[in-house]
């Protein structure tokens, strides 16, 4: 078992961009600098053709570095780009349908867990993970307190892994890890880091190595 398997790990979310080739290069740098479990690529405002092009750039890079590549958007794009799975946000009924259609062949995780009741409804559907926060929710240096509270509550009682959205500073991974969450998602903290994505990932992993609780302690 790798040392990182026993503590909170990183999830990367590339921000919206018109220069997908530059972002692909940034992702390559980031993933080459340290452990990342998963890359989630959102559709944002792209049309299906633009999103397909983005996925064809991002998915192979993630997979080449051992990270799962998930598509947040059109499931057809996930299939055509040979992504590992889907990040789903929508109704409980649609989540159940998506899980029935795509699992166990693909990873299917779920967002939209804005409060405890909704989180438990999502959990009953048995996704592969639950996501606390909004994909574009890294508007402050630190994670949103509500998301930290939800993650701590969830991690203490439910076996389904959770991802908590971090802040726009790398140091926010510590607060996220302290909740007991299995994963912390970073977006702007990595892709807009003043020293570059590689420095951000190296720093984040160093902080998690030093300060994240161990699951089997």
PLM ranges: what are they?
Residues 1-87, 92, 101-108, 113-128, ...:
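Conserved N-terminal beta1-alpha1 strand-loop-helix module at the mouth
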Residues 16, 136-139, 188:
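Short, well-ordered turn and helix-capping elements at secondary-structure junctions
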Residues 31, 142, 164:
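Active-site-adjacent loop and "lid" segments of alpha/beta metabolic enzymes
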Residues 93-96, 134-157:
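Flexible, gly/pro- and Lys/Arg-enriched active-site loops
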Residues 112, 144-147, 166:
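Short capping loops/turns at secondary-structure boundaries
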Residues 131, 162-168, 185:
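Glycine-rich anion-binding loop/nest that anchors nucleotide
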């Amino acid at each position: 078992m790798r040392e990182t398997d026993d503590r909170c790990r990183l999830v990367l979310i590339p921000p919206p961009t018109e220069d997908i080739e530059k972002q692909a290069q940034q992702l390559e740098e980031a993933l080459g600098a340290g452990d990342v479990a998963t890359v989630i690529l959102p559709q944002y405002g792209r049309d299906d053709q633009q999103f397909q092009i983005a996925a064809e750039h991002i998915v192979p890079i993630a997979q080449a570095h051992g990270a799962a590549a998930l598509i947040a958007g059109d499931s057809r794009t996930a299939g055509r780009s040979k992504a590992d799975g889907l990040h789903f946000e929508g109704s409980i009924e649609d989540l159940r349908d998506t899980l029935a259609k795509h699992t166990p062949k693909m990873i299917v995780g779920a967002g939209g867990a804005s409060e405890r009741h909704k989180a438990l409804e999502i959990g009953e559907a048995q996704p592969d993970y639950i996501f606390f926060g909004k994909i574009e929710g890294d508007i402050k240096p630190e994670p949103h307190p509500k998301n930290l509270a939800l993650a701590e509550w969830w991690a203490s009682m439910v076996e389904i892994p959770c991802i908590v959205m971090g802040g726009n500073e790398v140091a926010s991974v510590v607060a996220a890890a302290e909740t007991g969450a299995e994963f912390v998602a970073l977006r702007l903290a990595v892709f807009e880091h003043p020293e570059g994505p590689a420095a951000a990932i190296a720093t984040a992993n160093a902080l998690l190595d030093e300060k994240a609780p161990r699951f089997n302690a």
